[in-house]
Amino acid sequence: MSIPLYEVLILASILFAMGLACVVAWRANVIMMLIGIEIMLNAVMLTFVGGSAHWGIAEGQVFSLMIMALTSAEVSLALAMVAYLHRRKQSVDTDDFSSMKG
């Protein structure tokens, strides 16, 4: 039994909207922005996998693996910057990133 594509797209749209709302609502907090971006990328991965299953091709799953690799690199770099900023400023606000040099 397979889930219809429109249900996958509806779920992905809801996830993307939740991630976008998270990014827009908590623009001052870097960690919440990262969580919102991760939710949006998971919605994109769900769309790729759903389309891949619907049309019977493997490219969507390959793109999902590429997105997973991209997000792991993004999270590791972003969390390193957040840890550095927290050590220097005792804060994780986005306004404090303007003081970083490099």
Swiss-Prot record:
Main enzyme class: translocase
Main localisation: membrane
Domain of life: Bacteria
Residue ranges crossing the lipid bilayer per the database entry: 5-25, 30-50, 62-82
Assigned keywords, A-Z: Cell inner membrane, Cell membrane, Membrane, NAD, Quinone, Translocase, Transmembrane, Transmembrane helix, Transport, Ubiquinone
GO cellular component, one term: plasma membrane
Entry membrane topology: Multi-pass membrane protein
Catalyzed reaction equations: a quinone + NADH + 5 H(+)(in) = a quinol + NAD(+) + 4 H(+)(out)
GO MF annotation list: NADH:ubiquinone reductase (non-electrogenic) activity; quinone binding
Compartment(s): Cell inner membrane
GO BP annotations listed: ATP synthesis coupled electron transport
EC number: 7.1.1.-
Signal peptide: none
PANTHER family linked to this entry: NADH-UBIQUINONE OXIDOREDUCTASE CHAIN 4L (PTHR11434:SF16), NADH-UBIQUINONE OXIDOREDUCTASE SUBUNIT ND4L (PTHR11434)
Family: Belongs to the complex I subunit 4L family.
Function: NDH-1 shuttles electrons from NADH, via FMN and iron-sulfur (Fe-S) centers, to quinones in the respiratory chain. The immediate electron acceptor for the enzyme in this species is believed to be ubiquinone. Couples the redox reaction to proton translocation (for every two electrons transferred, four hydrogen ions are translocated across the cytoplasmic membrane), and thus conserves the redox energy in a proton gradient.
Quaternary assembly: NDH-1 is composed of 14 different subunits. Subunits NuoA, H, J, K, L, M, N constitute the membrane sector of the complex.
Name used for this protein in its record: NADH-quinone oxidoreductase subunit K 1
Organism: Geobacter sp. (strain M21)
Gene label: nuoK1
